[in-house]
Amino acid sequence: MSNGKIVQIIGAVVDVEFPRDAMPKVMEALKMQAPELTFEVQQQLGDGVVRTIAMGSTDGLRRGMDVLSTGNPIMVPVGQKTLGRIMNVLGDPVDEAGPIGAETTMPIHRKAPAYADQAATVEILETGIKVIDLIMPIAKGGKVGLFGGAGVGKTVTLMELIRNIAVQHSGFSVFAGVGERTREGNDFYHEMKEGGVLDKVALVYGQMNEPPGNRLRVALTGLTMAEYFRDEGRDVLLFVDNIYRYTLAGTEVSALLGRMPSAVGYQPTLADEMGRLQERITSTKTGSITSFQAVYVPADDLTDPSPATTFAHLDATLVLSRQVAELGIYPAVDPLDSTSRILDPQVVGEEHYTVARKVQGTLQKYKELRDIIAILGMDELSPEDKLAVSRARKLQRFLSQPFFVAEVFTGAPGKYVTLKDTIAGFKAIVEGEYDHLPEQAFYMVGGIEEAVEKAKTIQ
């Protein structure tokens, strides 16, 4: 513990001078009492001066103020006391519900698990959501990118995943809001409360209006909380919304530190920063962290360095489509655009793989025929094409599902469908066992038996 003095302030970057024999290390946290503020050391400039990034507003700071080195990186509370709470990048509560009271704290900078400690087998994480389990199965410890515009159901899908993991796998979730709109963070908190899943999730926010230091480190704060739960032997979900803003905060910090920008003005350390975060999100022999990352694609350009770097780390992509949402099919997942690395017969088994590919093939055929139907009508199609269209429309509707967290809005009770039932249901439709049932029977049901029951009421 040594004392230093502020010698220069440029925006969020603050230079602090320490005695030469007591210079703090890079990534160490420094604190000051009045105003209460934390800094993180980014560079050692020599002559006892370190360059730091402030984890808060630097308004009102002046040269000569005292700063204390803590000897540790930023330490955040971990454990079950964090559940149901909203915290900031430092792990301080911002929900006005008293102190966190956690017994344990952990540093936000840690090494990724060693190769020997990582889980060698691929295990499927059953989500109970038909379209996800069938078309883009998720591996325990996998990373899923969630692509979608405004209002297509990203938040509701995230909430349902949190709920299903909590109820079916007794797992916990951590939600890191990186560069979030404050309004969205507030809405998300209240929706979780209404959906009854708040006590199973820890929320860490670094909002849009906060300095870049907060937004850059808040993902690591959330990840550290998730790692603690994983090391207790649990299956944890980590939600990052939005991973693009993590990159953007890194760009701001990099520019403030005077580094030379690289392609499109991004920081030269883009791949390294992303890798350091992503490599820690993995399964070990004790537990798993499965992450869902909302990905904003600037100007819809998938070759932009930020989304391109993110893609390299993802195991699955979940694309929410406005066209699907307009048909009233929720979750509005595009089954032809969404992919998973583990949709492979050697991982999921021959039956699952074949059924998923047949479903996609039928839907693709319908997509190709749609223009002909729009111009000439159904009557001009060959009998085989008519059958393919009829099955595709049933499949399309069967991919919809009532959610538990949406019960309060829709009045329809939520459904959890096991992977076995999902495969059996889609297999039967593709093979024509239910060609005689009306397509409305397949809309917003759980398993295939429900569709059969619903058909009786329609006829």
Swiss-Prot record:
The UniProt annotation places ATP binding at G148, G149, A150, G151, V152, G153, K154, T155
Question: Key word Zinc present in the record?
Answer: no
Q: Does the keyword Nucleotide-binding apply?
A: yes
Protein name stated in the entry:
ATP synthase subunit beta
Q: Which NCBIfam families match?
A: atpD
Which leading EC class covers this enzyme? translocase
Describe its membrane topology: Peripheral membrane protein
Q: Describe the task this protein carries out.
A: Produces ATP from ADP in the presence of a proton gradient across the membrane. The catalytic sites are hosted primarily by the beta subunits.
Q: Where in the cell is it found?
A: Cell inner membrane
HAMAP family per the UniProt record, alphabetical: ATP_synth_beta_bact (MF_01347)
